[in-house]
Amino acid sequence: MKIISRNLLLFAALLLIYTLLFRFGLGALLTQKKWFWVVIISVLYGGLIFVTALMTGRRDGKENFIFDAGFRWNFTTFVVWGIASEAWFLLGLHSTYESIRAVHITLFIWGGFLFLHFILFLILRRRTIKGVHKTDIFE
């Protein structure tokens, strides 16, 4: 049972690539004022992250018997996206239509939901023995 598994690292690496590509595309489309395409790539970006998390998370669930209700994936996404977005602004790669404040507000709200997810994780963890659900052990 590994907290930082190969599947989680694969997800983090793919997420970083997706985020950088998304940021490049977002900046270019915002600069060109192509609002429709901004929405399209945003939805595609979110969908791609969801599918990647679903696939790597399911595979991890089969290989690594840890019951965390997806918290590790949520936390990894929060950290990778936050660092990539902050770095994007610190390096001056953002569009004039992008604001660091939007990143900070997103991280603040997301952090609140992440905290709630952590509480859920702790509650579910009480129902497990060393990360394995009790019903999986005693059936």
Label each residue range with its predicted role.
Residues 32-40, 66, 96-107:
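Non-cytosolic membrane-interface motifs at loop->transmembrane helix junctions
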Residues 1-13, 35-41:
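Alpha-helical transmembrane segments of integral membrane proteins, especially early/N-terminal helices
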Residues 72-101:
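C-terminal halves and exits of single transmembrane alpha-helices
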Residues 14, 93-137:
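Alpha-helical membrane-associated segments of multi-pass integral membrane proteins
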Residues 35-56, 109-113:
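Generic alpha-helical transmembrane segments
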Residues 52-79:
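Loop-to-transmembrane helix junctions at the membrane interface
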Residues 7-19, 80, 113:
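Alpha-helical transmembrane segments
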Residues 20-32, 58, 85-96:
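Juxtamembrane "helix-exit" motif on the non-cytosolic side of transmembrane helices
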